[in-house]
UniProtKB/Swiss-Prot annotation:
A molecular function GO annotation: structural constituent of ribosome
Residue ranges, compositional bias (Basic and acidic residues): 239-248
Pfam families in alphabetical order: Ribosomal_S3Ae (PF01015)
Disulfide bridge partners, by residue number: none
First and last residue of the signal peptide: none
Assembly: Component of the small ribosomal subunit. Mature ribosomes consist of a small (40S) and a large (60S) subunit. The 40S subunit contains about 33 different proteins and 1 molecule of RNA (18S). The 60S subunit contains about 49 different proteins and 3 molecules of RNA (28S, 5.8S and 5S).
Localisation per UniProt entry: Cytoplasm
Organism: Caenorhabditis briggsae
Protein name: Small ribosomal subunit protein eS1
Length: 257
C-alpha cells in the first residue's frame, strides 16, 4: 500500500500544440471580370500558398464566383446575377469567363401576376465558338387596350404558338454569335425585348425576360481568346523592376563568395 503522495507529476504525451493561424498559410488573388462589363476588379479570393505538388494557381481554376450585374456595371438597381468561372491565373490575377446567368428570387416573385397566363420556354443553342447554352425565358399575358374582362387568360393552342415563336427568336439571336456577343445581349436583355415585340402579334405580352442561362457544354479552354477578353487587365508579376543600363555596362566582379 502506497503511503504519502507522489509529487512527481508526469507530463501529458505530446504536450500542448501551438495554435497556428490558418490565414498565415494563405494568399490573396484578384478576380478579374471580362471586358464586357464596366467593373473589371470584381473582388478577391483566398487560396493556400504553393506547397510541394499542390500549386495554388491550379487550385483556383474552376472556381465559380457569383456577382450582381449592378456591381459589374455600377448600376444601383439590377435583378440579374452573373456567375464567372476562373479559367486561368496570370500573376496575382484570376482571369474569369461567363459561366451562367439568373434572375434574383425577389424579382421572380414580384412579376408573378394573378389572372394572367404564365408562359415559359427553354431551348439549347450552340454558339459559333463551340459553347452549348440552355436559355430559359419567362413571359406573362397582358390586357388589351379596350379590354373590359378582368382576366387575361389565353388558349393552350396559342400558348404553344407563342412558345414556338420564343424558341425561334432565341435561336436566331444566339446561333450566329460567339459567347462574348451573347453576354453583351444578356446585359441589356435585348433578347427579351425582341421576343416581346415578335410574340405580341399573337397575343399581347408583358414582363418578358431571359430568366436563366447556363452552359451545358463548353469547348477546350482557348487561352488566346481568354486573354483577348481581358486585354488590359493582364499584368505579368515580377520580383524586381526593369533597370535601364548603357550598352557598355559590365557587372562588377565579386571578390568573395
Amino acid at each position: 500500500m502506497a503511503v504519502g503522495k507522489n509529487n512527481n507529476k508526469m507530463g501529458k504525451k505530446g504536450g500542448k500544440k501551438k495554435a497556428v493561424d490558418p490565414f498565415s498559410r494563405k494568399e490573396w488573388y484578384d478576380i478579374k471580370a471580362p471586358n464586357m462589363f464596366n467593373t473589371r476588379q470584381v473582388g478577391k479570393t483566398l487560396i493556400n500558398r504553393t506547397q510541394g505538388t499542390k500549386i495554388a494557381s491550379e487550385g483556383l481554376k474552376g472556381r465559380v464566383f457569383e456577382v450582381s450585374l449592378g456591381d459589374l456595371n455600377n448600376s444601383e438597381a439590377d435583378f440579374r446575377k452573373f456567375k464567372l468561372i476562373a479559367e486561368d491565373v496570370q500573376g496575382k490575377n484570376v482571369l474569369t469567363n461567363f459561366h451562367a446567368m439568373s434572375m434574383t428570387h425577389d424579382k421572380l416573385c414580384s412579376i408573378v401576376k394573378k389572372w394572367h397566363t404564365l408562359i415559359e420556354a427553354n431551348t439549347a443553342v450552340k454558339t459559333t465558338d463551340g459553347y452549348t447554352l440552355r436559355v430559359f425565358v419567362i413571359a406573362f399575358t397582358k390586357k388589351s387596350a379596350n379590354q373590359v374582362k378582368k382576366t387575361s387568360y389565353t388558349k393552350t393552342s396559342k400558348i404553344r404558338k407563342i412558345r414556338s415563336e420564343m424558341i425561334s427568336c432565341i435561336e436566331k439571336e444566339v446561333t450566329g454569335c460567339d459567347l462574348k456577343e451573347v453576354v453583351s445581349k444578356l446585359i441589356p436583355d435585348s433578347i427579351g425585348k425582341d421576343i416581346e415585340k415578335t410574340c405580341s402579334k399573337l397575343y399581347p405580352l408583358q414582363e418578358v425576360y431571359i430568366r436563366k442561362v447556363k452552359i451545358i457544354k463548353r469547348p477546350k479552354i482557348d487561352l488566346g481568346r481568354l486573354h483577348d477578353l481581358h486585354g488590359d487587365s493582364i499584368t505579368v508579376g515580377a520580383d524586381g523592376e526593369k533597370v535601364d543600363r548603357p550598352d557598355d555596362y559590365e557587372p562588377p566582379v565579386q571578390q568573395e563568395v
